[in-house]
Amino acid sequence: AVLYAKEKKLPFYILGKGSNVLFSDEGFRGVVIEVGKGMSGIALERAGVVRVQAGTSMSAMAAKMAEWGLAGFEFAAGIPGTLGGGIAMNAGAYNGEIKDCILTATVLDQSGRVRILKADELELGYRTSIIQKEEYIVLEAEFYFESGNPEGIKAHMRDLNSRRRDKQPLEFPSAGSTFKRCLLYTSP
């Protein structure tokens, strides 16, 4: 779909679940390409290494990691949206973020070439990455997680979701987080 839109010189927008997206009431004159159920596979490649497609819900991925006894993605249990967008913005919460566990991301670059970027090439920072800067499209990614106790991982996820419910009005529509967390420095 992306290559077709480029060939026909049609403006296009890649959309996952639509979290962190606000469209104008005037609409979008172009093609909206949904990355969702058709790109939502999760596979255990080898001990601790998981390959996940970009359309996978971050919450579904967190649940699957817990089921498989893989620790380190609990922070994502309540994050709306898909993995592709999560990687692009280095999504995170409760002292965890994508950059803590990603090994590689397979992306489509602006020339239509598929590239595999290692974690350090992704330039993951606080809610930013090279994916945003270069307008890459995430196709899938590989992650590494340590083994853990499935019940302990699930309990940690329940605790984080409880804290999230206590602090956020989840029963109401929301545009999500508005402000970045400020980092404060003190003089030595």
Residue spans for each PLM region:
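Anion-binding (especially nucleotide phosphate/pyrophosphate-binding) glycine-rich loop
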Residues: 1-83
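Solvent-exposed residues in well-ordered beta-strands and their adjoining turns
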Residues: 36, 108, 143-148, 180-182
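Structural signature of FAD isoalloxazine-binding scaffolds in flavoprotein oxidoreductases
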Residues: 22-40, 88-118, 133-140
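Conserved small/polar residues in nucleotide/adenosyl-binding loops
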Residues: 185-188
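Flexible, small-/acidic-enriched active-site or ligand-binding loops
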Residues: 121-130
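A gly/ser-rich beta-alpha-beta helix-loop segment of oxidoreductase catalytic cores
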Residues: 62-103, 174, 178-180
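Oxyanion-binding "anion nests"
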Residues: 152-172, 178
